[in-house]
Regions:
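PLP-dependent aminotransferase-like
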Residues: 1-84, 91
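Short, structured coil segments at secondary-structure junctions
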Residues: 5, 100-101, 238
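Structural detector of well-ordered beta-strand residues that form the stable sheet scaffold
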Residues: 10, 79-81, 105, 241-243, ...
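A short alpha/beta connector and helix-capping loop motif
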Residues: 20-26, 94-104, 332, 337-340
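Active-site acidic short loop of glycosyltransferases
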Residues: 31-35, 94, 101-102, 314
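PLP-dependent aminotransferase class I/II
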Residues: 36-40, 45, 49-53, 91, ...
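Conserved active-site segment immediately N-terminal to the catalytic lysine
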Residues: 67-116, 147-148, 181-185
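Short glycine- and hydrophobic/aromatic-rich loop-to-beta-strand nucleating segment
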Residues: 105-106, 115, 120-123, 199-201
Length: 344
């Protein structure tokens, strides 16, 4: 979407041996043209949005900010749009994912903890949300019809509908009202709306989600215990590291179980993946860094500029984690993983 609207993509390397971005490198990457920062909640662990907020509020960063529309002027600083695709149900510093940043986006894709088969949701938390929009707004070169008395919260909701429905100013139901056939298309925008059927699936999932999260917590605890036992017999240079999904200031959604075979190469990690597959266990890698992908190479990105991200990738394996698995399944995965890693 960043490229689609004509904005420039800027990537920041991760911290050394940590999946969160390097926040000081983030500060160095900010220019007068920076409009939004997108921290990612990898594996369901909330990023440190409070740290990002502290950075964008630094006097020297505020002095660089050049707003380009009324929302940016009202914010008075760079916006923070949190990628919460993995973190539905997670919290950090007592706040839930979706209420921490200015804007947050969730994915309800089929492989997510909470699914509607496809689609997602967006939340926002703006101090001026209930203020009235004073004048017509223009987005992506297209004037958005002005509604007298509309608040900014209402406007952002309407704008989201327009962006996701070919910029049509009426949905299918509205067009069926008596004498209300006519509609307008205000811009060459997108088709990515969630259907009512998908939303119905989500409403049912809400009832089950707390128990699903609880099971994920138990599965991760079993994985942790198994790997702790493995590390007790491995030498210090070849420990298996896993993400900390729960601590005094955070609790993740326990979406993915990432491990790193420290001191090992990508080839050795791939060997483990192949050995696990031979035993009927599907594993994954999260993720191959974006600068290694063709689309981003074409934008001029080079993985050599992101050594920490590459270091995280070069020996990472993701063990299976979903609520269709039984605790016996988790035990089977652990037993085989331990046996294979010991044999490296």
């Amino acid at each position: 979407m960043v490229a689609h609207v004509g904005a420039k993509i800027v990537m920041v390397d991760s911290q050394k041996d940590c999946v969160e971005m390097d926040y000081e490198k983030l500060a160095d990457a900010i220019t007068e043209r920076t409009k939004v920062i997108v921290p990612v909640d990898l594996a369901g662990i909330c990023a440190d949005v409070d740290k990002v907020r502290e950075i964008v509020n630094r006097p020297e960063i505020l002095a660089k900010f050049r707003p380009a529309n009324d929302i940016q002027r009202l914010m008075g600083r760079i916006a923070i749009s949190n990628d919460c695709a993995h973190s539905f149900g997670a919290l950090r510093h007592g706040k839930m994912a979706g209420e921490i940043a200015d804007f947050s986006s969730f994915s309800f894709h089929a492989v997510k903890n909470f699914t509607t088969a496809e689609g997602g949701a967006m939340t926002w938390n703006l101090a001026f949300g209930n203020a009235v929009v004073p004048r017509q707004q223009v987005y992506c070169g297209s004037p958005v019809p002005f509604i007298e008395g509309e608040t900014w919260n209402e406007f952002i909701y309407r704008l989201s509908q327009l962006f996701s429905l070919h910029a049509q100013n009426k949905d299918a139901l509205a067009k069926t009202k008596l004498g209300a056939w006519e509609y307008d298309i205000i811009g060459p925008w997108y088709k990515c709306n969630m259907t009512d059927i998908m939303a119905a699936l989500g409403l049912v999932q809400f009832e089950r989600y707390p128990s699903m999260l609880e099971k994920r917590h138990k599965m991760v605890a079993m994985y942790n215990a198994g790997i702790d036992s493995l590390n007790a017999v491995l030498d210090a240079d070849h420990q298996v590291k896993y993400l900390n999904h729960k601590g005094p200031d955070h609790c993740s959604s326990h979406h993915l179980y990432l491990v790193r075979l420290t001191g090992r190469s990508r080839e050795e990690a791939n060997h483990v993946i192949e050995q696990m597959a031979e035993r009927g266990i599907a594993t994954n890698v999260h993720y191959k860094p974006l600068p290694m992908m063709t689309a981003y190479k074409a934008h001029g990105f080079d993985i050599a500029d992101f050594p920490n991200a590459y270091h995280l990738f070069e020996n990472e394996i993701t063990l299976p984690l979903n609520t269709k698995m039984s605790m016996e399944d988790v035990e089977y995965v652990v037993e085989n993983f331990v046996e294979i890693v010991k044999g490296l």
